[in-house]
């Protein structure tokens, strides 16, 4: 077998007739498949054993030679070679066609490659190929021209007139002759000459022809090979025929298509032998052409060939295309052995790195390991008896199983895998039942809940796979979210509620002001009912094992609550004692105001103090992030487990319930509604008098009701008891938000109708009172819209992720430093006056491009190429610096990837990024994964002429596909001062800008809102009106970097508006991929074709060579491609073909004789090679492992890694 990891590239091209014959093991002459009585393949048929190999291993067809000892013998009776039956998957056959046939891909594709080579229109080609017209192949000395079309009548007239003085033909034969006569060298030179003077359409056509001619010249393909003389027959096991239980056969569609070809071919041969009339022969040739077309790409021309029930048959092209095609179904995703799936249930007592595997499942998954161990222990004599023991489930196998799975991690995956945390490794523990147990804290990462979700289990087999699973994928390692570097394993629901309840403070609770000597005493008092969890007490600070207290504080009393004492036991000893949810307390120390001298009157002191807020979900997240920063992975995962256990325990103790009595209605609600009704009445009066338009009336009514709802909500919050269970649930962040509560106890407010327009009739009732029939009906629209939106959004978001992954899959960290001298100058991203993304967030984890100094003291804050940590970022912002130049993926010089310095910190680990990290895929997942959280709506914003601004998912798609945005802003092409804004015709406004050497005027539609006024100084490319800028226009007016910065800011605005944080670097990686191509305008003295789309690196390389040799370099202009287009324009044809438009990509690649250098991930997955990322990268593959010494017994627990 071919070693998959041993070849460097893959090449595709056209096959010559001789090449096809050389692949073949024999000619298929008959359309028969299998004899229905003997069930043996027919000789010379589509399943013939003589051509394709034996049906049974080591056995010829007639049974004369059986067993492996006759290996390689060809039977003298039936002619079948004695070998493995597996060869029926690889041996090909062929059909000698009685007449040449054109290949539909090259004739029918857009543009028609055959048409370009022959300089004929596809219409004319179709007429020739399908025998409607003659074409002159050799005009001789007649006035006819070569390639001139003649109708049947004209042909007869000219034949009588000139006799044999010219030759003309029809069908693929004539095409083949013309193609064979083409002199590529001469045609190419003629076209180059033509290009010098040609303009418009002629120039475009010449460039396209030249591209195809050059492709044929450089690839060594012969244009006449686009016409087939010999048709390859694919191996029979790939188009199988199987017997069903009723004695009938099920067969692949390809066999039907092949049978049609063979039948027609044989009939044509017979007609030719008989010397049939020309018209009959031509008809048969046309039918043969159509049969081959249907085999290669059914349905591409005319009506598709259908099978039973009018179903179009699946041809060779369909086998490759789409989600069910060969590429996406079998090559990019395969079903694997050693895997299983089951329903998940919660495992609250598991450790962070554990999962519960059902016994039966574990036994099946680890079967070979168990069998080996049974034999090794002498519990079974051989593998067979071990297998029988397992099938009988003998009692002794369970101990063995437990031994086998110890320290053998398994991978758990939940579909859809939206980001890399969708697959994590756990150490299995055996559990009874049939459900997988999952640790509650990893649910957020998987987006899993226990309402019937299922998960898949995979077993890593090799030692390397196990080591990678343990070191890189263990759930305890995946604490940070790759998209923003924040902890992803934050507690949720019950755990949040428990910790919130635990840290509550209550005035005058039982035992308030009691002084305790240590924690144990306080806990004892609590267990015996002398104090409550919420009681504020004093405890001797020296008894608390916290290393952050000063010596003076150790001799004082600490004012705290019993609950907070218990809460702080879960934190590391050297972490500050947390008494209040503030940044100061978390990061620096416990505030001094909580320490009092032992002589103080504690009760009076406590009574004078205000109550402190309990610890909500966000604070718990901050605590986890701080612990991670200071103590790293091991300590954090242990602390998380303690936090989880404590949360569950206390929320059980708290016994939160929701009763109808907890929903208290508001007294003032009635009068607020009355007031609103009056205001609406006044607005309607103004409208009736014609003082305002209907649109204005609508907007104002909506505003009134929204204000009424907000007022009710505000009063509700104030009237609520802090210990109300519903309030506690939403305040802690466990579940629900304040608007849910408003709907229960206040009013439901305004609803949208099916079109998304807000109905101006508000729902004034709440759920506590109940809705009227009309109100209920109005609210059903919103409910239904919510559900349909979610369903549509999921599909859209998934498709977006797929396109993003495809365009960035080959971006990998390739080197330590690319040595670039360029950088990106960044400042806080703003929308008007509001800061969308502050500067320190953008700086953290990046490398500085220039030395950063304090503007006043001139002291160095960070040197060039220093990593900017959180502390340095804060220092920079505190120094009043507003913009900083950093290293960025935009300006990185690395080919096919990014370097470590330009990328910066790996957000998923919080450390420097490693060479080999697949940052492209991480970026795509980070942008795609929150896609489902974005809204689908196009907001209708206020004002009469309110433009629809696209937001949410549609806006993200618009940006990444580089489409013309909705509500487009008008941009200026000159920089300078706005000298006048005047009203022109049709109430349009005319803005005039005076540049340094140019004056421009722009007509602005009446409805647009201006962003400038007279006297404003504008730069080139700046927007004059509100709305989104078209990036394609921006790239024309300004430079690439401005476009990159604009796209980055726009993406961040959409996500931040929805409260989703994404690291800048992910967007940078994606945007860089959209701008990696250049369109050649002037070719200079290089041999590049004009109008070619080239990779910037290849272009620069070609120009460098030109300059070194002293010739004229080419010039080009950067092009912004949408992600779909960029994916299809990639250098790798395997990656592009497996993405979309498979036949077009393959046609193009075959003619150009393309080489795929296998640089990206997809190409290598398709070929079954190790991906060139992570540990599959060259520098890691060359490492050799050696045994230093054997360990006697592994005593370390897994958490001590």
UniProtKB/Swiss-Prot annotation:
A single GO cellular-component term on record: DNA-directed RNA polymerase complex
Residues engaged in binding Zn(2+) 1: 60, 62, 75, 78
One GO MF term attached to the UniProt entry: zinc ion binding
Keywords: DNA-directed RNA polymerase, Magnesium, Metal-binding, Nucleotidyltransferase, Transcription, Transferase, Zinc
Cofactor note: Binds 1 Mg(2+) ion per subunit. Binds 2 Zn(2+) ions per subunit.
UniProt-annotated binding residues for Mg(2+): 449, 451, 453
UniProt family annotation: Belongs to the RNA polymerase beta' chain family.
Name of the protein in its database record: DNA-directed RNA polymerase subunit beta'
């Amino acid at each position: 077998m071919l070693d998959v990891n041993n070849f460097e590239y893959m090449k595709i091209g056209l096959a010559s007739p001789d090449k096809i014959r050389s692949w073949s093991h024999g000619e298929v002459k008959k359309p028969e498949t299998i004899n229905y009585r003997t069930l043996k393949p027919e000789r010379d048929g589509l399943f013939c054993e003589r051509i394709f190999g034996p049906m049974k291993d080591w056995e010829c067809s007639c049974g004369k030679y059986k067993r492996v000892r006759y290996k390689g013998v060809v039977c003298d009776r039936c002619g079948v070679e004695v070998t493995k039956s597996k060869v029926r998957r690889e041996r090909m056959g062929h059909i000698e066609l009685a007449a040449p046939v054109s290949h539909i891909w090259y004739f029918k594709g857009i543009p028609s490659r055959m048409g370009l080579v022959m300089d004929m229109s596809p219409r004319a080609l179709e007429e020739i190929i399908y025998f409607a017209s003659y074409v002159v192949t050799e005009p001789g000395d007649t006035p006819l021209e070569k390639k001139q079309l003649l109708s049947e009548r004209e042909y007869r007239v000219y034949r009588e007139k000139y006799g044999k003085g010219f030759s003309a033909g029809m069908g693929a034969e004539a095409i083949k002759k013309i193609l064979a006569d083409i002199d590529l060298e001469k045609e190419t030179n003629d076209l180059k000459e033509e290009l010098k003077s040609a303009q418009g359409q002629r120039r475009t056509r010449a460039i396209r022809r030249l591209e195809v001619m050059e492709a044929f010249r450089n690839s060594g393909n012969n244009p006449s090979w686009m016409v087939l003389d010999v048709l390859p027959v694919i191996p029979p096991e790939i188009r199988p025929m199987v017997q069903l239980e009723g004695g009938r056969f099920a067969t692949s569609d390809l066999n039907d298509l092949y049978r049609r070809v063979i039948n027609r071919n044989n009939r044509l041969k017979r007609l030719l032998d008989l010397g049939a009339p020309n018209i009959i022969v031509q008809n048969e040739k046309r039918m043969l052409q159509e049969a081959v077309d249907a085999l290669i790409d059914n349905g591409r021309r005319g009506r598709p060939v259908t099978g039973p029930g009018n179903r179009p048959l699946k041809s060779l092209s369909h086998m490759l295309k789409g989600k069910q095609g060969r590429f996406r179904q079998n090559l990019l995703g395969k079903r694997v052995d050693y895997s299983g799936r089951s329903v998940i249930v919660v495992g609250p007592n598991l450790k962070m790195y554990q999962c519960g595997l059902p016994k039966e499942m574990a036994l099946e998954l680890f079967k070979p390991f168990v069998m080996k161990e049974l034999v090794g222990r002498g519990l079974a004599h051989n593998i067979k008896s071990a297998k029988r023991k397992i099938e009988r489930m003998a009692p002794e196998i369970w101990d063995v199983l437990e031994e086998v799975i110890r320290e053998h991690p398994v991978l758990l995956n939940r579909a859809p895998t939206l980001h890399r945390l969708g697959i994590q490794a756990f150490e299995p523990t055996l559990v009874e039942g049939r459900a997988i147990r999952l640790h509650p804290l990893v649910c957020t990462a998987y987006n899993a809940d226990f309402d019937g979700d299922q998960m898949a289990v995979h077993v890593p087999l090799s030692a390397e796979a196990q080591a990678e699973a343990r070191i890189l994928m263990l759930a305890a390692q995946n604490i940070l979210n790759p998209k923003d570097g924040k902890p992803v394993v934050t507690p949720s629901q019950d755990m949040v509620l428990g910790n919130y309840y635990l840290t509550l403070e209550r005035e005058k609770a039982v035992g308030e002001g009691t002084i305790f000597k240590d924690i144990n005493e306080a806990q004892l008092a609590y267990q015996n009912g002398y104090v409550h969890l919420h009681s504020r007490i004093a405890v001797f600070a020296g008894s608390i094992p916290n290393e952050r207290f000063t010596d003076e504080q150790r001799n004082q009393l600490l004012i705290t609550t019993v609950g907070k004492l218990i809460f702080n036991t879960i934190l590391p000893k050297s972490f500050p004692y947390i008494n209040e949810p503030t940044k100061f307390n978390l990061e620096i120390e416990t505030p001094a105001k909580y320490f009092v001298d032992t002589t103080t009157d504690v009760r009076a002191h406590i009574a004078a103090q205000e109550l402190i807020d309990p610890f909500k979900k966000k604070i718990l997240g901050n605590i986890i992030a701080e612990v991670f920063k200071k103590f790293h992975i091991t300590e954090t995962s242990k602390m998380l487990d303690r936090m989880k256990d404590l949360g569950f325990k206390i929320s059980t103790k708290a016994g939160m319930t929701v009763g109808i009595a907890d929903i208290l209605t508001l007294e003032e609600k009635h009068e607020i509604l009355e007031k609103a009704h009056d205001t609406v009445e006044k607005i309607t009066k103004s409208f009736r008098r014609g003082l305002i338009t209907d649109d204005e009336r609508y907007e104002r009514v909506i505003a009134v009701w929204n204000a009424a709802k907000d007022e009710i909500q505000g009063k509700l919050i104030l009237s609520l008891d802090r210990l109300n269970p519903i309030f506690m649930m939403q305040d802690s962040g466990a579940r629900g938000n304040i608007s849910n509560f408003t709907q229960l106890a206040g009013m439901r407010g305004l609803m949208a109708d099916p079109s998304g327009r807000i109905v101006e009739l508000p729902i004034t009732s709440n759920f506590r009172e109940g809705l009227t029939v009309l109100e209920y009906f109005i609210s059903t629209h919103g409910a239904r819209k919510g559900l349909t939106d979610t369903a549509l959004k999921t599909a859209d978001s998934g498709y977006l992720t797929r396109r993003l992954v495809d365009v960035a899959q080959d971006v990998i960290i390739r080197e330590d430093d690319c040595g670039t001298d360029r950088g990106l100058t960044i400042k806080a991203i703003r929308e008007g006056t509001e800061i969308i993304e502050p500067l320190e967030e953008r700086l953290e984890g990046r490398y500085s491009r220039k030395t950063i100094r304090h503007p006043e003291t001139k002291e160095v804050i960070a040197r060039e190429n220093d990593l900017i940590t959180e502390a340095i970022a804060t220092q920079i912002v505190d120094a009043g610096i507003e913009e900083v130049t950093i290293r960025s993926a935009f300006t990185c010089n690395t080919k096919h990837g990014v370097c470590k310095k330009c990328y910066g910190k790996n957000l998923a680990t919080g450390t420097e990024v490693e060479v080999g990290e697949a940052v492209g895929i991480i970026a795509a997942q980070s942008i795609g994964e929150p896609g489902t959280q974005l809204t689908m709506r196009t907001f209708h914003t206020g004002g009469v002429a309110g433009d629809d601004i696209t937001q949410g998912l549609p806006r993200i798609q618009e940006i990444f596909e580089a489409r013309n945005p909705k509500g487009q802003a008008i941009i200026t092409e000159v920089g300078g001062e706005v000298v006048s804004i005047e009203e022109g015709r049709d109430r349009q406004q005319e803005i005039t800008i005076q540049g340094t050497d140019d004056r421009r005027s722009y007509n602005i539609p009446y409805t647009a809102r201006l962003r400038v006024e007279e006297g404003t100084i504008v730069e080139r490319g700046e927007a004059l009106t509100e709305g989104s800028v078209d990036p394609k226009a921006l790239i024309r007016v300004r430079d690439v970097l401005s476009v990159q910065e604009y796209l980055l800011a726009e993406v961040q605005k959409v996500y931040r508006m929805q409260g989703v944080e994404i690291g800048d670097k992910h967007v940078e990686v994606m945007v860089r991929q959209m701008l990696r191509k250049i369109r050649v305008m002037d070719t200079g003295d290089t041999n590049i074709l004009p109008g070619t789309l080239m990779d910037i690196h290849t272009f620069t390389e070609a120009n460098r060579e030109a300059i070194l040799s002293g010739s004229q370099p080419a010039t080009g202009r950067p092009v912004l491609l949408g992600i779909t287009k960029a994916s299809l324009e990639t250098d790798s044809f395997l990656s592009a073909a497996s993405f979309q438009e498979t036949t077009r990509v393959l046609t193009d690649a075959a003619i150009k004789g393309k080489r795929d250098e296998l640089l990206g991930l997809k190409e290598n997955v398709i070929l079954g090679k190790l991906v060139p990322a992570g540990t599959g990268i060259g520098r890691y593959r060359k490492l050799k492992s050696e045994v230093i010494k054997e360990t006697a017994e592994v005593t370390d627990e897994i958490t001590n890694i």
